[in-house]
A protein has these predicted regions:
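Short N-terminal helix-loop-first-beta-strand/juxtamembrane motif that initiates sensory/input modules
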Residues: 62-73, 104-124, 154, 201-222, ...
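Solvent-exposed, extracytoplasmic
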Residues: 51, 85, 91-111, 130-133, ...
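Sensory input modules used in signal transduction
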Residues: 157-159, 173, 277
Length: 280
């Protein structure tokens, strides 16, 4: 988004002319310049938006592929199957549990926060990372991403707050299958700060007043903004109410990925901006 603060400068340019020509020329020039600025800004935003969208799409596609790789790993399938058969107190499970430490290498390789395994009933039976103690033994049966995954559908969760790990998260859930039956899921917590940074990377190409941020259907910020009072400690804490939110809200709720809008509106700082809106 780029502020429109050009009218004063253009009007001053015509003070040396007669009154009527000044008003007419200033009006025409201002509107022509405004139109040109909008077109130029929209062009920059389109290029940036397309590049950014492709980058985000490629990132999540790579994580889906990472999840698929894990779901095809025999040691993981065998571990979950053993847990389902013998239970957590069995000698068989205790031996395999130790072997699952190899998943730490995949956390590093795939650049994840954590990998965790869930049995067929929704109980987490193994996890990596600093939140391991919170995740293991926790009940995930009510999570939509688990319900979809245990039904055979690989999926990416929405941004949400977890009462288990006490932070906002996004996860990739992939079903584990053996002999034609879904026996559990392998799940990956993605690094939320990295996703937030990726969304805003390169916004400077639009201009010094360029801004980009992610919101939900109620205007809750999923990222900090680049400018203003919401540039720090605002993600998942602050909401905005703008024309952009009004336009996006119903489209987000219906999942209309084809929706786009380009035009003028007042942003969260009260400034008139050229904005480009889309649903991802």
């Amino acid at each position: 988004m780029q502020n429109l603060k050009i009218s004063k400068k253009l009007l001053v340019m015509f003070l040396v002319t007669a009154l009527i020509p000044m008003l007419v020329l200033a009006f025409v020039s201002y509107n022509q310049s405004k139109t040109a600025l909008i077109e130029k800004t929209n062009e920059k935003m389109f290029i940036y938006g397309s590049t950014n969208y492709n980058r985000i799409e490629q990132y999540f596609q790579s994580k889906l592929e990472n999840g698929w790789v894990l779901s095809q790993t025999a040691r993981i399938i065998n571990a979950v199957d053993t847990y389902n058969q013998y239970g957590e107190n069995s000698t068989e499970w205790k031996e395999i549990y130790k072997d699952l430490e190899f998943l730490n290498s995949y956390v590093e390789k795939f650049n994840l926060d954590s990998i965790y395994l869930i049995d067929k009933n929704g109980k987490s039976i193994f996890a990596t990372g600093p939140n391991r103690a919170k995740i293991e033994g926790a009940d995930f049966s009510g999570r939509d991403y688990f319900k979809d995954s245990i039904s055979g559908k690989q999926n990416i969760s929405v941004f949400a707050y977890s009462d288990i790990i006490k932070m906002h998260y996004i996860t990739v859930a992939t079903p584990l299958e053996k002999n034609g039956k879904y026996i559990g899921t392998v799940n990956m917590y993605l690094p939320v700060p990295q996703i937030q940074e990726m969304i805003q990377d390169g916004i400077e190409v639009i201009g010094k007043t360029g801004d980009v941020y992610l919101i939900d259907s109620e205007g809750l910020l999923y990222t900090n903004t680049k400018l203003g009072e919401f540039s720090q400690n605002a993600a998942f804490e602050k909401s905005i109410k703008t024309k952009a939110v009004e336009l996006l809200s119903p489209e987000i709720k219906t999942g209309n990925l084809d929706f786009t809008f380009s035009g003028l509106y007042k942003d969260y700082r009260g400034n008139t901006v050229v904005g480009n809106l889309s649903v991802i």
